[in-house]
């Protein structure tokens, strides 16, 4: 148990702010991140860091262990699911590069790339497949350089958009193709402070196959030391065997389906890791069956059932999705009584 009392020190980190770049279509997940590196307390995790200006934490209401006593405050309860997977993941290729020569080994290993002063570099990075995880960007120098990191599942046909409705977007076509296509996606933004050994890692996980990286420098070159992902998802392990000799396409379909199931399961099941990250119980029923067909792990299924119970409103009706800040009920609660009344 961590003793988080008034002996702890704290400060308000002014370096971060939400980055609200408009995302076309129905996007209801969190915002991107804006980091002003000059305001970040670099080295705070090191024992030699000077924390003399940090303030003592104020003790709030004490935590109470569930089952140990009657208590009106917050109860400390065991986590119902195991920790998420955290696995290093390297990009496969630079598909487009503008304004800089790509050094041998870049992306595959930790290889530096220098962006000259007063220049602009654009890189389109390809992960090879869709993933969910935390993106890390390691860099040095480049004071006042602007770094924009955008994320997309796929690229779109290159014609102009006349609508913001996702169902009216141009077609994606072959997702392996990038030439002549348009990048649409949410983004993070960093303003470099000119220091050495900077590490920007997203606070929340992102979803991407493609990452669009743009760096605009000021009067100092910026050294991009590495860029990579850390895959994060619920630690499912596929425990089934499947064989269909002469039908390789079926094995490929199973591979794609299992990847989809994994990316749509983090701390909850979710309908879509890119646009919504919401646990709809109609979708969850299907995901739970996939889980029980392919694994011996029922923790997520039990967790979803419990969260469905927690979503029940005063009328005794479950919400259509939960956890969610927006109250929404399933149409089945309307259609079924209507059907019964018509009998």
Specify the residue positions occupied by each region the protein language model found:
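Extended ligand-binding clefts on enzyme/binding-domain cores
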Residues: 277-295
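Single conserved hydrophobic/aromatic residue that forms the stacking wall/gate
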Residues: 332-343
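Extracellular/oxidizing-compartment recognition motifs
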Residues: 1-274, 283, 299-304, 308, ...
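Generic alpha-helical structural context detector
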Residues: 289-292, 306, 310
């Amino acid at each position: 148990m961590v003793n988080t009392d008034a002996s702890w020190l704290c400060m308000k980190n002014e370096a971060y702010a939400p980055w609200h770049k408009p995302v076309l279509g129905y996007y209801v997940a969190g915002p991107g991140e804006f980091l002003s590196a000059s305001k970040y307390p670099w080295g705070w995790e090191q024992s030699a860091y000077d924390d003399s200006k940090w303030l003592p934490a104020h003790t709030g209401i004490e935590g109470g262990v569930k089952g140990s006593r009657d208590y009106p405050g917050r109860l400390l309860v065991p986590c119902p699911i195991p920790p998420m997977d955290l696995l290093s993941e390297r990009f496969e290729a630079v598909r487009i590069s503008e304004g800089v020569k790509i050094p041998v080994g870049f992306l595959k290993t930790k290889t530096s790339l220098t962006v000259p002063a007063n220049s602009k570099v654009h890189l389109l990075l390809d992960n090879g497949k869709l993933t969910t995880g935390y993106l890390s960007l390691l860099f040095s120098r480049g004071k006042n350089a602007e770094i924009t990191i955008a994320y997309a599942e796929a690229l779109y046909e290159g014609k102009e958009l006349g609508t913001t409705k996702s169902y009216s977007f141009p077609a994606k076509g072959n997702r392996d193709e990038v030439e002549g296509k348009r990048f649409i996606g949410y983004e993070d933004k960093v303003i470099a402070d000119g220091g050495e050994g900077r590490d920007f890692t997203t606070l929340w996980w992102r979803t991407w196959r493609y990452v669009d990286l743009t760096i605009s420098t000021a009067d100092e070159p910026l050294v991009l030391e590495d860029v990579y992902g850390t895959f994060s998802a619920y630690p499912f392990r596929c425990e089934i065997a499947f064989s269909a000799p002469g039908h390789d396409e079926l094995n490929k379909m199973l591979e794609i389906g299992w990847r989809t199931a994994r990316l749509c399961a983090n701390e909850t099941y979710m309908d879509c890791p890119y646009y919504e990250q919401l646990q709809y119980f109609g979708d969850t029923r299907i995901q739970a069956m996939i889980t029980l067909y392919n694994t011996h792990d029922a923790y997520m299924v039990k967790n979803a059932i419990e969260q469905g119970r927690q979503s029940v409103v005063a009328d005794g009706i479950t919400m259509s999705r939960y956890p969610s800040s927006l109250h929404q009920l399933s149409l089945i609660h309307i259609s079924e009584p209507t059907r019964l009344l018509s009998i």
